Amino acid sequence: MEGVQRYFKLDRSRQDDFLYPLIFQEYIYALSYDHGLNRSILLENVGYDNKSSLLIVKRLITRMYQQNHLIFSDSNQNPFFGHNKNFYSQMISEGFGVIVEIPFSLRLVSSLEGKEIAKSHNLRSIHSIFPFLEDKFPHLKYVSDILIPHPIHLEILVQALRYWVKDASSLHLLRFFLHEYHNWNSMITPKKSISIFSKRNQRFFLFLYNFHVCEYDSIFIFIRNQSYHLRSTSYGALLGRIFFYGKIEHFVEVFANDFQTILWLFKNPFMHYVRYQGKSILASKGAPLLMNKWKYYLVNFWQCHFYVWSQPVRIHINQLSKHSLDFLGYLSSVRLNPSVVRSQMLENAFIIDNAIKKFDTIVPIIPIIGSLAKARFCNALGHPISKPSWADSSDYDIIDRFVRICRNISHYHSGSSKKKNLYRIKYILRLSCARTLARKHKSTVRAFLKRLGSEFLEEFLTEEEQALSLILPRVSSTSRSLYRGRFWYFDIICINDLANHE
């Protein structure tokens, strides 16, 4: 980032950020390579078999501007990239992904200069959302699960990106690169992009999708804050946008009504909005009529401002007491916790039934078992099986791989209210590890576990379980309540791969 900042300091007199020359800088591809190595994923870090060559990049860009090579074909041997299609597309997308993120990173750094945001790094954690849900949702009544629609055409994203990247050459290169692919909708949808691109080749396309969602957030939350009696303060650190207020005025003209009149229809101090990736949650304490107003408002908002089509019937309004939210790898719900209180006054006794609303989070065991079965750790019924592809590794590497996967899952799902499902996942991974080692040594699982003893089981304990076992005895009621309790961590910045089953 220091090298990038020096590049932009060379020409402070010009206000435009020219990104195109950075494509020919080899350290850009080194940055994308380092980012891939440092990325925290569930399984192994995918190695990088080929080296980025500046000559290859220049030759590829030259071919992109030759019209006779822009021939669309349904065959796997694309005339644009030839036999090295995967390598070229991976290199350009990774490098371009780093480049287009530069203006956003620099503006973010400059916007935070001179501002003190207490513990802002903690707000990056995914788990920071759940304490907010625990605090607010027990007091709310209705909730809507909303899937943010993706753009019908990627040219919409290119046009929106012009407000940030004002370099015409970079935008032209972006168009060339996007037009090479046929199935545009599969690129912009994160889950489908994984099946088309490798795990190291999706950074740029996820950036485009996140940029689209952040554009939606920036305008929607601005209007939401205007409609509230109590303004939101958590959105102050986000970046400002060029021509933002001009777009707001255009959006108001679409409705052909006074802006304040529109906002008056939605005034409600108990409306809450949570979003992660392409899924958002809208919850309210008000009547269903207000939720219906917001539903049709969102549909018109998407169609008129982002030119995307969505049907109101796909946005469902449910009661929180009767509905579970499938969000961020957890099944969350608000349940009633009944309690009976006996009150004695002189000679009269009263029995009072009291029900307390509690926010409950559990691990969805069936989807996670499906993910484990897809990764060949168990069968479809959840019975552990060996991992033959790992049998050639050393015993230490095999155990280390299984332990890291188990601890990552336990760390991410530490906020579960019920630990039974989490213990079942640990059991599957532990026995799968034992079967893999027994397969390698041509032995039985029983004999192998007998030889290793309890040390093998202790490897799968998480750090917090090991710490609790040292601090408190397991027989005490306090220790049992801590083991059953929920833990939210502030160091989780991406959803676990096995939890991302949507």
UniProtKB/Swiss-Prot annotation:
It comes from the Eukaryota. Keywords: Chloroplast, mRNA processing, Plastid, RNA-binding, tRNA processing. Transmembrane segments: none annotated. InterPro entries: Domain_X, Maturase_MatK, Maturase_MatK_N. GO terms for molecular function: RNA binding. Pfam families: Intron_maturas2, MatK_N. GO terms for cellular component: chloroplast. GO terms for biological process: mRNA processing; RNA splicing; tRNA processing. It is found in: Plastid, Chloroplast. Belongs to the intron maturase 2 family. MatK subfamily. Usually encoded in the trnK tRNA gene intron. Probably assists in splicing its own and other chloroplast group II introns. This is Maturase K. It comes from Vitis vinifera.
